[in-house]
Amino acid sequence: HSTHKLLNALSQASYIHVREGRGAINFSRFNQAYMMHATTSPLYAICASNDVAVSMMDGNSGLSLTQEVIDEAVDFRQAMARLYKEFTADGSWFFKPWNKEVVTDPQTGKTYDFADAPTKLLTTVQDCWVMHPGESWHGFKDIPDNWSMLDPIKVSILAPGMGEDGELEETGVPAALVTAWLGRHGIVPTRTTDFQIMFLFSMGVTRGKWGTLVNTLCSFKRHYDANTPLAQVMPEL
């Protein structure tokens, strides 16, 4: 996997994981096959950064760093969910986080709106992220139960324009337009589709950084609602 995306390794750094399962791999044979495709003059700084990443993840420090990433991603999701509730309650629109709208505490049976759920519940209970059949939010009608779940740190937000059934609505905000606006402010999403924008939370993403993202999305909404001429907000288009 790409260690430069989620761990603190240099760009282009990655690991190959060899699992000692029922069909064990002959390491010598694997190594020879790997060397056929590897350079004999690697950039040793990249190799060293992988070693540093391993040391950082060793023991409790790795658990703490990973938990911080999950906590920040969940805080961002909840902030977006609260803004979505606030704007839609006034008959307006906003971007919606793609996750469950309601979660249940398995210990107490109490149900919470996602925006108001305890952080500990969302960061420790796996069922808060599982896609169950019959739920409309994920759009997969025939998905087997407990077959798939969201990764909390891969945060997708939905722009208005497509219903939960996958059908286009009468009006909407193209995600590509939002991505262009974010790019003008130095924010590069991980992926953009028709009405969905994904952001990958990793080590180093702090409340200050995702707070800037929230403010930039709010500024897009202000310009959109004011019908500001495109030539003023994005003249390069």
PLM features: what roles do these ranges have?
Residues 51-59:
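Short glycine/serine- and small hydrophobic-enriched flexible loop segments
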